[in-house]
Amino acid sequence: IKEEIKMTIIVTGGAGFIGSNFVFHMLNKYPDYRIVCLDCLTYAGNLSTLEPVMDNPNFRFVKESITDRDAVYKLFEEEHPDMVVNFAAESHVDRSIENPQVFLDTNIIGTSVLMDACRKYGIKRYHQVSTDEVYGDLPLDRPDLFFHEDTPIHTSSPYSSSKAAADLLVLAYHRTYGLPVTISRCSNNYGPY
């Protein structure tokens, strides 16, 4: 007998490196949660990474972009999510210098689409996965310096600017509409996947 689902989480960018590890963690730790992965499978996403969970009855993969408002709203209507965790992003500094528009579209407009859907469908929590790149650079000759939550935003590329803009938009939705949000700004990640 299938256990009753206690929570449904839409994980955007879940076929990427960090997102897929989050998917694995959540399905292992919370077997009574439903995880819906929304990913358009750009250069950063790899569907084969999710192969170990494809047969899990509490997992669903949807190949769509967070910039596609109709697809996002349709998914929210089908799944009735409790929470959204947004890993989806264009995320390479050098690529952002070559083609900034795609970074603006995905990282800002895509976040806007998600925020509107969260507001419309009354989600309980939205988590924005951001980057420490929004803080700028630390001097190499000062290993004693660190970024912290109060460090001012000081972007240095189209990538970091697009992520900072998305973060500010998320905070604006919290303040304006009372949407429950959190933001994490992690540094580079590495590991086996």
What are these regions (language model features)?
Residues 2-192:
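N-terminal Rossmann-like NAD(P)+-binding domain of SDR-like oxidoreductases, especially those catalyzing
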